[in-house]
Amino acid sequence: MGFRTLDDVDVTGKRVLVRVDFNVPMSQGKVCDETRLKRHKETLLELQKRGAKLILLSHCGRPKGQGEPEFSLRPVVRVLEKIINQPVAFAPDCVGVAAQTAIEALQNGGLLLLENVRFHPGEEKNDCSFAEALAHNGDLYVNDAFSVSHRAHASVEGITHLLPSYAGRSLQCELQALEKGLDNPKRPVVALVGGAKVSSKLFVLNHLVEKVDYLVIGGGMANSFLAAQGVHIGKSLCEHALMQTIKKVIEKAQEYQCTLLLPVDAVVGFRFEKGAPHRLYDIGDIPDDGMILDIGTRSIAHINEVIDKAATLVWNGPLGVFEMSPFDQGTIAVARHAAECSLTGKCVSIAGGGDTVFALNHAGVANDFTYLSTAGGAFLEWMEGKVLPGIFALRQA
């Protein structure tokens, strides 16, 4: 994979700085979702068992380079202790005397969580002096957070120039899964891309048509593709300014022999609200006052037929307005079929992005996919074919 892992280092008695992603949703000082915390369990327990002194680095929220209580990592401590069944100490800063004092008290196998690295402006600026202050507290560095590896920040990229650097198990596992998705996949490869706007995923689409055999477009994005082909879409969400750009994507798909699939029917609502009056229409018959809010039954069947052909499936973005019933049914139906194909070994299935994870959980199949990435921006940038600064830095370390 081009970088060193925990298999390549003796950590006994070493101060190991571990970059984790504890950027979790909180409400009134309580953690609302433990998913990201659980992703690091294997790495932390392995290092603890091997006698390392673990010093955890993370950000939380966007505190604008200064301490803000609502973004403190302190509430994470109790939840993390429950997950790993080990005591976790907390330091009220990530550098300086407070951090150093807490680190000096660590025993072999001890765990310490430092306060939010974004409480310092040097973190997001990738400031050399801040990276040096972080590195001063460790003997080696482990990146276990793919979800932040698209950021050229001090605790992700800068620090790798100052300490021997390694990939943690979570990062290693994620990269191995993603490699199976687009870098070295089994074919045919099917990509499902949904969501509201083409503009947010234009680079993704342009990259995917070069890589995959079938590209399925759903969600609000599909409306813009349909409009670009002259289809009347009523009052549906559409990015009319992108018509020429979308036509170029369609032409590129033809050039690379990538089969593009768009909805052939749709569930059309007449108000944008839960339980709004709705009807099923063929794509050529969308009424003037209607809004396409979900894919229809024939579209579901077509997509499922394509998934049946897949050896590799990559999914990002819901296929309808999944947060509003009954316009979640298309996403649910396709998700359950994809999960069944994955469980029976017909395909390797990889899904990622915040809305995608939420939608698959909503469908009750999140655990049935081969790999589910909790990364948002990093997953999208990987789908765009970009080099992620945190991963590149590990390969150079």
UniProtKB/Swiss-Prot annotation:
Binding annotation for substrate: D21, F22, N23, R36, H59, C60, G61, R62, R118, R151
Localization terms from the record: Cytoplasm
Pathway: Carbohydrate degradation; glycolysis; pyruvate from D-glyceraldehyde 3-phosphate: step 2/5
GO-annotated cellular components: cytosol
Domain of life the protein comes from: Bacteria
Pfam families: PGK
InterPro entries xref list: Phosphoglycerate_kinase, Phosphoglycerate_kinase_CS, Phosphoglycerate_kinase_N, Phosphoglycerate_kinase_sf
Stated family: Belongs to the phosphoglycerate kinase family.
Stated name of the protein: Phosphoglycerate kinase
Biological source species: Bartonella quintana (strain Toulouse) (Rochalimaea quintana)
GN (gene name): pgk
